[in-house]
Amino acid sequence: MSDKVKQLKWLIVLFLFLLAIPSYFAYNHFRQSSALKEAFEKNERIEVLHRLMASEKYAPDIRKAGYVVPPDGAIRLDGGIDSIEIKGDIDLDISNPGRNGVTAYFRIEIDGKITSVLYELDKNFDLVSSAYFQINEKNIKESVTIPKAEEERLLKIVQKELEDFMETMYQTLYG
């Protein structure tokens, strides 16, 4: 009789242990998902981008929302999503955010030449720094300047695209 009680106790312990493992992973998944939603609701843009791009977890959702990310194999190899392509008024690439901001890259035509544009944006998507490059006649990349009004116009487009991205992702995830 005592052997059966011991055996029952061991089965209960084993069952609880086996139940604890999936419970831990389910809790961890819920906690990560709620942290992303909380970042969305607090309008912490850099935190949202960081969480969306930290792994392949949200890649299918980003694709479903109509944005372009690398293939899952490349994401696993890189340890996260290195860039998201946003097709809109301009074709914008945003990189995995740093601690305080995000980099936006796009190409436009200025004065009949293709110009590569690089914007460093802070947590509010305000401009921290900008760089403009064109390929000259000798196939050498050279820095160019653009009028302040043009820079402000482009910045507004970039900010609108990023805000639309954030809104679309929130609707896709929590709709």
PLM region spans:
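A general marker of short, structured functional hotspots
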Residues: 20-23, 54, 63, 161, ...
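Short, Lys/Arg-rich N-terminal segment immediately upstream of the first membrane anchor
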Residues: 1-7
